[in-house]
């Protein structure tokens, strides 16, 4: 049985106060808080097992290597990969997406080709493709969304053609909460011979993922949004594609042999993991995944849907408040503005009430442009939030509106 109060006991930071008020943390879309098991695992690694992986024959190195590869195997199972070799550890989702843009893109995208990017993407799934297009003389095409925040998949036939090489799309919008119809996107892309690159930062947290069922070619996410440490991310890639890709960075541990005449590379995934690995981050992320595997994804999703529904119903009763992203099936992300109230002012007042939300453009400036606004307030819920906190958000917004309109 899903017991949110018991879950909250596992997150030490949720018991602190800010400005003398209980912390109401509604910014998990930016970074999620960490359960005690992750905190203790990271601490133990620094205290007891601090040694480079894949490089030593001594006990500490070998033990750290075993834990690192076990984390890779656990994460592979969690996302539904066919094998652990399809999991590449990176510095984060941004690094994962750039790896594909440089390694796959430079090898397989040419002048006159096109790259399709959805309008609702985070900058990390826009800018690398723009940079690739500039390097290669390719065209960027944009798949728009409608006023409700639903992706216009009906326009795919007019945007995907025989020169489309990459389709970049989010599993769940970090601003609107929209979960696009990925099956339709993948089918259209694959019919044209294009690869599909999915930003899974929000999707992997809200409802989980099965990359083989999704049939995406690449899937990227960050550990810190999945209750894991910062500075660690994952790139899933179909093995046959990873094997065709040249390395993105050169250095130690990604090589097989090195001579001045020729260098040969390690097999996947190691050929994409140059340099000293963030083994603490990877093992910590494995522990976060282990934490998540204790729960039924359907129960997490039902809990978060209840939070979203309660907050939405309460906020809709506030005069002049607009919610952005009303497509059915959205995840637990709620962005809004109040007429006549700047989002930064709203965020500052909520902060003084102990409520942490995100304000600004959310690294999704094209979404702001679509709605003609310079910023939004965003509440993003997690498995440790409560209905009382959803009510606190609404009460805080009501109080802020009264203060700022008087």
Question: PLM features: residue spans?
Answer:
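Pyridoxal 5′-phosphate
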Residues: 1-406
């Amino acid at each position: 049985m899903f017991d949110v109060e018991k879950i909250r006991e596992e997150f030490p930071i949720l018991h602190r106060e800010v400005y003398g008020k209980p912390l109401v943390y509604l910014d998990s879309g930016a970074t999620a808080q960490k359960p005690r098991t992750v905190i203790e695992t990271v601490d133990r690694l620094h205290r007891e097992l601090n040694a480079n992986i894949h490089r030593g024959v001594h006990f500490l190195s070998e033990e750290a290597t075993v834990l690192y590869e076990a984390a890779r195997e656990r994460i592979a199972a969690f996302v539904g990969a066919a094998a652990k070799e399809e999991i590449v550890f990176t510095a984060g989702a941004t690094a994962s997406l750039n790896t594909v843009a440089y390694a796959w893109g430079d090898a397989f995208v040419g002048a006159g080709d096109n790259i399709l990017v959805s309008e609702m993407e985070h900058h990390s799934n826009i800018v690398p493709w723009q940079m690739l297009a500039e390097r290669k003389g390719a065209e960027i095409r944009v798949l728009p969304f409608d006023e409700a925040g639903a992706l216009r998949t009906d326009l795919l036939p007019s945007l995907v053609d025989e020169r489309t090489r990459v389709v970049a799309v989010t599993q769940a919008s970090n601003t609107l909460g929209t979960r696009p119809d990925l099956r339709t996107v993948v089918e259209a892309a694959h019919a044209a011979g294009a690869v599909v690159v999915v930003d899974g930062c929000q999707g992997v947290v809200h409802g989980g993922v099965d990359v083989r069922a999704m049939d995406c070619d690449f899937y990227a996410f960050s550990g810190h949004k999945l209750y894991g440490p910062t500075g660690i991310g994952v790139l899933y890639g179909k093995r046959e594609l990873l094997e065709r890709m040249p390395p993105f960075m050169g250095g130690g541990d990604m090589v097989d042999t090195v001579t001045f005449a020729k260098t040969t590379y390690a097999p996947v995934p190691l050929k994409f993991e140059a340099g000293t690995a963030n083994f603490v981050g990877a093992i910590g992320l494995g522990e976060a995944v282990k934490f998540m595997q204790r729960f039924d994804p359907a129960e997490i999703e039902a809990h978060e849907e209840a939070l979203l529904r309660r907050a939405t119903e309460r906020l809709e009763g506030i005069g002049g408040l607009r919610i952005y992203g009303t497509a059915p099936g959205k995840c637990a992300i709620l962005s809004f503005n109040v007429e006549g109230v700047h989002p930064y002012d709203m965020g500052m007042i909520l902060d003084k009430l102990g409520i942490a939300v995100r304000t600004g453009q959310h690294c999704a400036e094209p979404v702001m442009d679509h709605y003609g606004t310079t910023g939004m307030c965003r509440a993003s819920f997690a498995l440790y939030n409560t209905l009382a906190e959803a009510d606190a958000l609404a009460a805080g917004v009501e109080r802020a509106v009264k203060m700022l309109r008087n």
